[in-house]
């Protein structure tokens, strides 16, 4: 792991929040594991990141968050996220968990949010902090994950949503796309809808709880929203589903084609992988009552 960021590297605008965090006891002084887990709900604009997971030479969400946490807690930390997002993919509700020690329990939630906000750039938003039982995992305790993919099918470029929609610039029939989407609801082998190399030797069955396509309006822009909820998703699964539905929406394939793609269990049978910037990780569902305010 990288060493903890030094105080000299903290921006002047972060000093107040940073000094408040240092006023709390250091976890390094009393490394007694507590019966709690810190869970962070955060959002981010994915445009500037190589993805959530850390990469040696590129900026990542996990890297920025880890360095901020290590500055505040004054120790190394290991993060577990609800779902790894690719480069360019956004999040409104990503969840990250990390074990904490008895010394950490005295940290004020309000001060911790302020410190993490001050120590991260504008494209990361610390939304909320939770306390969960010892051993809780943001990944393995998740019951369902939800994504929204936004498409602008208008001939005019989107303005406010430019970096989080796919400007398709052509007519799409949202009703036909929605009809086709229903064939993917339930438990299926989604091998046709994931990155081929990532499926080698791995299980490709997933359960899709719901999938819908509808016309919406956001910030004055007319968009098509593809909303999907499932227990877990394969690499590029959501974006490949969107790309396949677009083939139907544009009239190049019939609604029934989706059944052929699903049955083929071959990535070549499906449509293209839709661009990353249109995808947003919007929600994670956990067992009721397991997350309590920090």
PLM ranges: what are they?
Residues 2-294:
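Structured-RNA-binding interfaces characteristic of tRNA pseudouridine synthases
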